Amino acid sequence: MSKEKFERTKPHVNVGTIGHVDHGKTTLTAAITTVLAKTYGGAARAFDQIDNAPEEKARGITINTSHVEYDTPTRHYAHVDCPGHADYVKNMITGAAQMDGAILVVAATDGPMPQTREHILLGRQVGVPYIIVFLNKCDMVDDEELLELVEMEVRELLSQYDFPGDDTPIVRGSALKALEGDAEWEAKILELAGFLDSYIPEPERAIDKPFLLPIEDVFSISGRGTVVTGRVERGIIKVGEEVEIVGIKETQKSTCTGVEMFRKLLDEGRAGENVGVLLRGIKREEIERGQVLAKPGTIKPHTKFESEVYILSKDEGGRHTPFFKGYRPQFYFRTTDVTGTIELPEGVEMVMPGDNIKMVVTLIHPIAMDDGLRFAIREGGRTVGAGVVAKVLS
């Protein structure tokens, strides 16, 4: 029994396979689970178990995703693999499967293809911090020079999108041969697992980040003052600490004079907990849903940003018609809707349901935001799109 307990203490890292259709992402996913299970213990997953991905909903969007888990001696990995290109786009934009690092699969027989480029760009836009390359199907290429050429192309492509192409680990392998139990190629899977361990740093846990709580509700308690409620997104709030109230209006400062959960008074509220925070010297009408409480100086309000968005198709309950420049929907951040205007990329006249597109958004009120913040696009309470802040502009 003691072993089970030990497993849980390993750092947990989220990864996924990305890359062009038919380059071997799902075969590689199966090979990793199989080879690591054989070497270090754990459950192997067959190709067809992974390929038959269940549907799930994230922000009202249907995404097909397979989740597998595996262990190396030092870490526990949760790995996501998507069957279709559209699923990757949706997954990365909604953040349904947030990745601490990605394995880019490139077939040595083809070299980089259009979706290879698109997935690298998406990775950059949505903040995938690290990419490791698995050069697949190397058993089918005899020419060493050809492999070097493909490797060089991949490095150039990564550098083009601000990943460190020259320093990126590239493993030459064959997922299929490894899956079939060929020892020479199994060794390449272990080499890849070694890079997952060494190249992707341990992710910072939510509790170690600066305090932030999106405000859901505001109450006034006679004799005690104003209480805001919500779920702590990150960090810890302790009684007596200063906080800032950010977004929508001018930023204000206050002090937390109490934290409560389930009607009990606590010394602190931590990431993941639903709490009420009592604020000193703030009137009920000076604060509203949609603002955030944050550690002073850690987050600023912004109105203009570059984003990567996915527009729901008609089948997903989205719009039935395209939209054009001048479109003014609501952008739903954390707990509230804010109206905004959009600028489309040069040469783009209209956006169709089912498209993914880069757009610059200008909100009518400032919202507390950082790069990587997810949002929904809504019309009258109905979700018509999902997006991520790629870059705050002002």
From Swiss-Prot:
Residues 19-26 are annotated as: G1. The keyword Transmembrane helix does not apply. Changing G223D: Inhibits codon-induced conformational changes leading to GTPase activation on the ribosome. The modification N6-acetyllysine is found at K314. Residues 174-176 are annotated as: G5. GO terms for biological process: response to antibiotic; translational elongation. InterPro entries: EF-Tu_GTP-bd, EF-Tu_GTPase, EFTu-like_2, EFTU_2, G_TR_CS, P-loop_NTPase, Small_GTP-bd, T_Tr_GTP-bd_dom. The N-terminus is blocked. Methylated in vivo on Lys-57 in response to nutrient starvation. Residues 81-84 are annotated as: G3. The modification N6-methyllysine is found at K57. Mg(2+) binds at T26. Residues 136-139 are annotated as: G4. Keywords: Acetylation, Antibiotic resistance, Cell inner membrane, Cell membrane, Cytoplasm, Elongation factor, GTP-binding, Hydrolase, Magnesium, Membrane, Metal-binding, Methylation, Nucleotide-binding, Phosphoprotein, Protein biosynthesis, RNA-binding. GTP binds at residues 19-26, 81-85, 136-139. The modification N6,N6-dimethyllysine is found at K57. It catalyses: GTP + H2O = GDP + phosphate + H(+). GTP hydrolase that promotes the GTP-dependent binding of aminoacyl-tRNA to the A-site of ribosomes during protein biosynthesis. PANTHER family: ELONGATION FACTOR TU, MITOCHONDRIAL, ELONGATION FACTOR TU-RELATED. This is Elongation factor Tu 2.
